[in-house]
Amino acid sequence: MSAQDFLVELGTEELPPKALASLGDAFLAGIEKGLQAAGLNYTGKQVYAAPRRLAVLIRQLDVQQPDRSINIDGPPLQAAFNAEGEPTQAALGFAKKCGVELAEIDQSGPKLRFSQHIPGKATVGLLPTIVEDSLNDLPIPKRMRWAASREEFVRPTQWLVMLLGDQVVDCTILSQKAGRESRGHRFHHPENVLITTPANYVEDLRKAYVLADFAERRELISKRTAELAMQQEGTAIVPPALLDEVTALVEWPVPLVCSFEERFLEVPQEALITTMQDNQKYFCLLDSEGKLLPRFITVANVESRDPKQIVQGNEKVVRPRLTDAEFFFKQDKKQPLETFNERLKNVVFQAQLGTVYDKAERVSRLAAFIAPLIGGDAQRAGRAGLLSKCDLATEMVGEFPEMQGVAGYYYALNDGEPEDVALALNEQYMPRGAGAELPQTLTGAAVAIADKLDTLVGIFGIGMLPTGSKDPYALRRAALGVLRILIEKQLDLDLTGAVEFAVKQFGAKIKAPGLAEQVLEFIFDRLRARYEDEGIDVATYLSVRALQPGSALDFDQRVQAVQAFRKLPEAEALAAVNKRVSNLLSKAEGAIAEQVEPKYFDNANEFSLYSAIQQADQAVQPMAAARQYSESLARLAALRDPVDAFFEAVMVNAEDAKVRANRYALLSRLRGLFLGVADISLLG
């Protein structure tokens, strides 16, 4: 079957830059879906996305659908005809369903059968519907209409190219009649561009100063920006999302170096970077020490004969932005940071939980409680907690919300606060996302944990639990943040005590029985997904969860130990034994004695197991005290042989009540050794 390249390009007014790449991918996916549904084969595919166009190239597409045959079985012959040979309603209904007369139905087999040969259609006739369906299915939250047209799309359409081989596909889509004329760069090549064949699409547009390939433009911008930064003895800050957005804004990218006055460097560099990235889409430059240079890179969409004009224009545009940041910084510094706390009395945190001022007071007390438990200073943590929300009332954060915490850090330093107190004002929000940076100071860790626990307890206390995808207070992220800080920073905090302390801080604002237990369960449930992401089996998590350790660090150490234990050759058998022992002990009548009485042994294997348990107990006690859980389980693995021998030779449920009770006590000692680490009976 012959094949030809297929190209479709929809020209529009400027598309939303943040959505451009995803729109292109969805356009390609929709066309592929349509081609596959039509049974059309092809050898390759490529999507192109630029500010004013979405295009898809399909290589070596079948020009004709393959013929196909359909066979539909109907009712059995005995149900299709009565004794007189007349057709029944079942037969007539089947023929009607197939859209033919009963005489056209095959009656030679055990059942009625309708067979039909369907010749394949020409691909050129199928493509308009496939393209139109793909465009209709694009993920566009809000479509628009334009002029007198009743068509709807993300932006007004301007032209349409559709070629199968070197022939135009005759159709009209979104009010645009298909042709072979595209458009070049607005300024460098305002004339139409004749697309000779689909294979020549990219090069035809390149000659018209349009780089249609999103990936090519992105790579060019990234590479050229790095080169220019190196020439300035700096490194460019190139966040992937910003790079994608800039790529979506230009058809013919030309990166240029611009500068601003050095006096602006007295302003916190985070504020300058924020305004240059978010508002102007510039790439900022850092020196070798990570400090902001008074230069930045803009990406022009034209190759100017006088690039200085573009540079000067961008420098002129950014100056008022930087001047605003400078003004806010100077204004805020005119008064101590602590004085902004008063303004927070009028800022509601949550209607039932009080103001942001109230929250800061609670965080201060909770941070002071937590700090000494993780090796920090209670006084400094309390001070940091008290100042933690002050910058929310500053002009800087009012203009640049991303500066919360960062602004507080600079203002605290300006007021002469200790370095760790100042750092904690920014670190309280860490981690800001999955895999993001953690607090580096103990003061910051204490405030970060306190802030998150206060939110968890408060929101749970008023019954606003997260459901499904709805989590307006980001409680899942808060819980994961607490766990990451404690585990990755190796901080041994008893969360039970911390959560109970947090509950008390709310006083009469919340009355929820079992609130502390509910919050703790929610926090530790977050570990399940964390371990699954790390490839740790859920049974390992559950074996530790059964013991309900209050320390996240201790929990993690136990999980890692169980994971290592499961790789030992004895693990499976010992897990099965523990499960058997657990079942036996659960059926025991009355309390199980704590002491084992050797005088009731009547089998050598009882003595052997008892001796092995005694030796193991002495060996693992110091290990358990030092939380050497892996070493402890490795030592307990040596119990496999005496345990196997015991169960092979000894009937646990002996007729003599004292012998039976003593054997239960022996098995309880055995199980207790393993429960010092985890309930490995759950591993089976």
UniProtKB/Swiss-Prot annotation:
Write down a Pfam family by its short name: DALR_1
Query: Could you tell me the keywords of this UniProt record?
Result: Aminoacyl-tRNA synthetase, ATP-binding, Cytoplasm, Ligase, Nucleotide-binding, Protein biosynthesis
* GO terms, biological process: arginyl-tRNA aminoacylation; glycyl-tRNA aminoacylation
Q: What is its EC number?
A: 6.1.1.14
Mind telling me which InterPro entries this protein's record contains? DALR_anticod-bd (IPR008909), Gly-tRNA-synth_bsu (IPR015944), Gly-tRNA-synth_heterodimer (IPR006194)
Q: What is its main location?
A: cytoplasm
Q: Name one GO molecular function term.
A: ATP binding
Q: What's one GO-annotated cellular component?
A: cytosol
Q: Which reaction does it catalyse?
A: tRNA(Gly) + glycine + ATP = glycyl-tRNA(Gly) + AMP + diphosphate
Where does the UniProt annotation locate this protein?
Cytoplasm
Q: Which PROSITE patterns does this entry report, sorted A to Z?
A: AA_TRNA_LIGASE_II_GLYAB
HAMAP family cross-referenced by the UniProt entry: Gly_tRNA_synth_beta
Q: What does the annotation say about its assembly with partners?
A: Tetramer of two alpha and two beta subunits.
Its family?
A: Belongs to the class-II aminoacyl-tRNA synthetase family.
**Under which name does UniProt file this protein?**
Glycine--tRNA ligase beta subunit
Which species does the entry assign this protein to? Pseudomonas putida (strain ATCC 47054 / DSM 6125 / CFBP 8728 / NCIMB 11950 / KT2440)
